[in-house]
């Protein structure tokens, strides 16, 4: 993605910066201090940096997610385990799990099987949601998903049944 396209995406989402418009304190904290955290963490310097800005930006997000949620089992289908382990040392990569704690997967048609194994504390990150918008919208509106965050480059879904369903656009 070139810098002009990046700038256009950012400008289009400018009114969704830093949690503006989010009424839920829990969701606001998640957006402000996990998704859009700008302070350098203790392990940022040790994390891989191959020059790809998007891979690095998403990797730092996965680091912050793991740091926040502290999962023991992670389903990683996109190769970000270095970032996840830096955020949670006890995390181990699994191919499959009875109950999902944290999953980072490419957006795909077979999401139904994955969502069936999600509990109230599960977090699933779908990558490249902008490439398959219709599929992302069907995931957002799935009855099992309670909170969905559209970050353009990826989507994060939560499953806490005590909360009212809500879908957010976040300028990431």
Predicted regions and their residues:
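A short alpha-helical cap/connector motif
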Residues: 1-119, 130-172
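Glycine-centered, small-residue-biased loops immediately flanking beta-strands
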Residues: 122
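Generic beta-sheet signal
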Residues: 126-127
């Amino acid at each position: 993605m070139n810098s002009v396209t990046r700038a256009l995406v950012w400008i289009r989402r400018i009114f969704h910066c830093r949690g503006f418009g989010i009424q839920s304190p829990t969701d606001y904290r998640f957006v402000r201090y996990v998704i859009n955290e700008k302070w350098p963490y203790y392990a940022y310097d040790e994390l891989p940096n191959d020059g790809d800005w998007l891979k690095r930006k998403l990797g730092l997000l996965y680091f912050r997610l793991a740091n926040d949620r502290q999962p023991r089992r992670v389903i990683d289908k996109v190769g970000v385990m270095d970032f996840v382990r830096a955020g949670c040392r006890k995390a181990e990569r699994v191919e499959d799990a009875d109950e999902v704690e944290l999953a980072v997967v490419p957006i795909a048609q077979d999401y139904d099987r994955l969502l069936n194994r999600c509990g109230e504390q599960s977090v699933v990150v779908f990558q490249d949601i902008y490439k398959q918008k219709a599929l992302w919208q069907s995931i957002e509106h799935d009855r099992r998903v309670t909170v969905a965050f559209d970050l353009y480059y990826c989507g994060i879904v939560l499953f806490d049944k005590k909360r009212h369903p809500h879908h957010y656009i976040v300028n990431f």
